[in-house]
């Protein structure tokens, strides 16, 4: 697994990143928001993390629900005001609004969740180890020589396929790049 530079993706962090991106974009295009919750949202995230460490899960859920509501308010405010804006401004917001909708709508058991705002290709890969159960990144196959560990090829495999199914394509790529066939 080639890990990406992402922190452990909690719901609260993703909500706060959505809010930050939306507020930053609205400032850039001079869209006046009714409220941007620049004090309340980080405070709610902090409190949710505090409640989690104190094992006060009901309070944590309440804080996260409030945070999610605030992000939804900012999103709807921007969507309302974009109707009066020119097409180029609307197109600048398309990707960010789509990611925000996706993050606000995803549930725990959903497939194809968004784990990172800046790197949407990140997947959750279960490792089966006690100390590190999950890694967030993309599965890769790296082909090296037997004696000197010289890298012949590297390839990413989106969708977390079974390792045995990736071997043939890695060897094929190494054969194409090096010009020699691998020995059995």
Where do the model's predicted regions map?
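Anion-binding and metal-coordination hotspots
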Residues: 1-184
């Amino acid at each position: 697994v080639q890990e990406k530079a992402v922190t452990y993706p909690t719901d609260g962090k993703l909500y706060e990143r959505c809010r930050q991106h939306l507020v930053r974009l609205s400032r850039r295009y001079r869209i006046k928001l009714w409220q941007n919750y620049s004090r309340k949202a980080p405070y709610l995230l902090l409190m949710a993390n505090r409640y989690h460490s104190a094992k006060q899960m009901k309070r944590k859920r309440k804080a996260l629900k409030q945070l999610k509501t605030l992000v939804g308010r900012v999103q709807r405010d921007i969507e309302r005001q974009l109707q009066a804006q020119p097409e180029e401004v609307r197109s600048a917001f398309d990707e960010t609004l789509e990611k925000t909708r996706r993050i606000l709508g995803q549930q725990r058991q959903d497939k194809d969740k968004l784990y990172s705002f800046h790197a949407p290709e990140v997947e959750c890969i279960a490792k089966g180890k006690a100390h590190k159960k999950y890694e967030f990144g993309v599965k890769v196959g790296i082909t090296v020589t037997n004696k000197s560990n010289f890298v012949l090829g590297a390839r990413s495999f989106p969708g977390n396929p079974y390792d045995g199914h990736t071997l043939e394509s890695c060897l094929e790529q190494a054969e194409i790049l090096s010009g020699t066939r691998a020995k059995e």
